[in-house]
């Protein structure tokens, strides 16, 4: 299957989708009292998410009645920053991010010996609807000069956007 290239940006969807992602991420049952913030990390620890491109339009159809249907995606990544140096601590971070990714993709995950599964994606406003969430594998970056290390989980939300031109 050929990968679609962006043909534009869903600029008006940036705030809508970003807010929904922040709320969804903070519903993850494995947070244990922690919060995932938007583009805000401490020097040595924290969990945040960021999107370097914002929402992108991949395809667009305009009907003869000027009804527009766009296929869009919102690529983002979750960053887990830590000063952990032991292998088992790093494996716990990798497991946390992998479980978060599975949960976002509606796969069952085990947290504290209980199974959780996301049943439905959050509703978006302004005629946008999430159709699918996909993820890649989490990975660690090279440690910073202060010995903190960032672990990344790339995620992509696919959604539709419908509106009338008139």
Residue ranges and their predicted role:
Residues 1-37, 56-166:
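Charged, amphipathic alpha-helical segments and their flanking helix caps
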Residues 40-62:
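Amphipathic, interaction-prone secondary-structure segments
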């Amino acid at each position: 299957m050929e990968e679609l290239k962006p043909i534009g940006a869903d600029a008006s969807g940036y705030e809508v989708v970003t807010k929904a992602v922040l709320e969804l991420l903070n519903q993850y049952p494995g947070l244990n009292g922690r919060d995932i913030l938007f583009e805000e990390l401490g020097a040595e620890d924290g969990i945040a998410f960021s999107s370097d491109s914002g929402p992108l339009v991949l395809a667009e159809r305009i009907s003869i009645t000027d009804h527009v249907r766009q296929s869009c995606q919102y690529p983002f990544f979750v960053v887990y920053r830590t000063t952990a140096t032991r292998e088992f601590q790093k494996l716990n971070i990798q497991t946390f991010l992998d479980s978060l990714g599975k949960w976002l993709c509606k796969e069952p995950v085990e947290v504290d010996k209980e199974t959780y599964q996301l049943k439905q994606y959050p509703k978006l406003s302004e005629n946008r609807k999430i159709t699918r969430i996909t993820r890649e594998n989490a990975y660690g970056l090279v440690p910073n000069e202060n010995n903190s290390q960032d672990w990344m989980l790339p995620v992509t939300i696919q959604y539709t956007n419908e509106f009338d031109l008139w």
